[in-house]
Amino acid sequence: MRIFVPILALALLAGCSSTKKLAESLDTRQNSGACPAAGSLYDAARIVDFASGSQDENIYTNIAYTGEITDVRTFCRYTADHPLEAEVEVDFAFGKGPAAAGASHDFGYWVAVTRRSGKVLAKEHYTVQAAFKSGSKLAGTTERVNRITIPRADETIAGSNFEIIVGFDLSDEQLAFNREGKRFRLDAGQ
């Protein structure tokens, strides 16, 4: 028993820093204001990858893969004059077209923090993998981006002054395709 007590005391002391973090995470004070609005940029919310060399012919049989951002959710925490800490969940839907070469495909996407006026404050790039089960042409996943930190000048600056925007990394041709209103949905009619 005498050996057990010092070991227990050492374990408790070693855990002090993590105990402080746990106590901070259990803070029950209300946020100083609303969380930033979150969503996908309309022109960058979907992507159609055509088979190599077929970009000139935007027809269904040349589609390799498609992707769409279907939902974006933000969770945040901030009190007093502390920075706003947020995380974002992004739901993706994917399609595998007739010209697909494999059972998986990587898509690049970005997450940006902007002022409500549209000025981009920060932008990070990520990759999401579309993994298609055997025989399936549809897939989906949810990606979580943790620890988005938005500094605030003082406690009067609320999360509603910012937006968190998500979109696919698009080539000039893919962006033009989207802006022309063209789209192929591999799940249409299913």
Q: PLM ranges: what are they?
A:
Residues R2-A9:
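Sec-dependent signal peptide recognition
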Residues S17-K20:
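Bacterial signal peptide processing site
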Residues E24-A51:
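Post-signal peptide N-terminal segment of mature Sec-exported envelope proteins
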Residues Q55-D56, I63-V72, T141-E143, A153, ...:
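Scaffold/interface architecture of coatomer-like assemblies
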Residues L26, S32, L121-Q190:
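Helix-rich interaction surfaces within compact, conserved domain-sized segments
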Residues D71, C76-K123:
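Mid-length scaffold segments of soluble, non-membrane domains
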Residues L12-G15:
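C-terminal motif of bacterial Sec signal peptides marking the signal peptidase cleavage site
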